[in-house]
Amino acid sequence: MTEPGLAPAPETAVDEVVGTAREALLGAPTLGAPEYLRFAEAVSEGAGRRWAEVAEANAQDVEDGRARGLSGPFLDRIRLEERHLELFGALSRSIARELPELVRPGPVVTGLGGLRARRVPKPLGVVFMIYEAKPTVTVEGALVAVCSGNATILRGSTEIAATNAVLADVLADALVESELPAGMVQVLGDTDRNQFRELLRRDDAVDLVIPRGSPSLVDYCRSATGIPVIVGGSGVNHLYVHESSDPELAVRLLLDSKLPEPAGCTALEMALVDEGAADAFFAVLAERAAAGDLLDLRLRVPEELIADLPEELVAAQPVEPLADHDDGREYLDLVLAVRVVDGVDEAVDHIRRHGSGHTEGIVSGSAEATERFCRRVDAAAVVVNGSLRLHDGPTMGLGAELAISTGRLHVRGPVTIDALVTHTWRIEGNGAVRFLD
């Protein structure tokens, strides 16, 4: 018997999963109906009521991951804390604020024979999300997709199976409380790869795929499906420190871009430091290291520079020689590479060769250097004199976010609720024809 809140087991045909989702869409209220607001509230309240169960299941997932030898940063991605419950409440409130604008029709345009046309928002349909670790995505994916009128199929990784089982029940209860069709959210209870692959082939029933995870997961989804994909891409991100920058500011931004969430998609992987800024930069970095501010951060620096680094830095932090394979690498760990470059052009050329097009940054006191960098760097976001972690939907004031897309079509940057809505043109013809008259 299938556990409450979980989708059918893998031996059940994928037809049942997609059929349930399509049927739910047919029975769902129109976009903007009050049931969607009630669902957002019910998810937040339900998570609060059952937080002890969620926390217990999550602790089991973390312990299982530790026993399997998962890294500390990866375990941090699995771990839920009280702040995440607060996040769910904030997400629900944010969606409530965004829905009126989301459902507002576009302006009326007048055409041939006095016809009147306007764009009317419509849900995309069935959204299939695949993600690794991060059980917060289970709640975020359900809230953003359902409140924009879509049915969603959620497939988390094995590492969060226990947490997802409880969250699936929370979501199922919220659908009942809000009187939405039960099939609007399906949390797959088994991470069977055959089921996953078959769902990617169902372009007749699934309208959008959103993968969040490793580059290999994202690349597989792109190559294995004919369904449109919003890519939550990997973050091989750089921070360029121009010679005109304040070294104190540069180091502060570097640390905030790396330490709080080293496995996050906006985490800094390599600092590109101007030759003219290197001495002051490393001196400040050494001061912060001596004060314990770098935590367990491991540095990778060109071998020829290691001997010239401040003694305090080498004494406080592990420093390893930088290798060619470190270029373009997403560490997903407390590892930071540093390269010294000869000006803006060399920094930009390095980013063009090795960046992933996610988030790039510059620390600079020169308007000319900043403008040159921003014009030449092609990424979903370019941050000027700020932490790379500012590239975040809620932080930017854009509202709830599902992922950060590195694609070029439909959406680039934060994937907010409006990215899950398409439009229908409503044309009032008033009897107009094109040719017969």
Positions of the model-derived regions?
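Solvent-exposed alpha-helices and their adjacent loops that cap or buttress functional pockets
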Residues: 109, 117-123, 146, 177-181, ...
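Short, well-ordered beta-strand elements within core beta-sheets of diverse protein domains
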Residues: 23-30, 271-273, 333-342, 357-362
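N-terminal Rossmann-like NAD(P)+-binding subdomain of aldehyde/semialdehyde dehydrogenases
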Residues: 1-117, 144
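C-terminal core of ALDH-fold dehydrogenases
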Residues: 38-42, 344-437
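Conserved small-residue-rich beta-alpha loop and adjacent elements
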Residues: 90, 97, 101-174, 178, ...
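A structured beta-alpha segment of the ubiquitous adenosine-cofactor-binding alpha/beta core
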Residues: 81, 116-119, 187-203
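ALDH superfamily catalytic-core signature
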Residues: 8-12, 132-151, 166, 170, ...
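Residue-level signal for inorganic ion chemistry
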Residues: 36, 127, 149, 209, ...
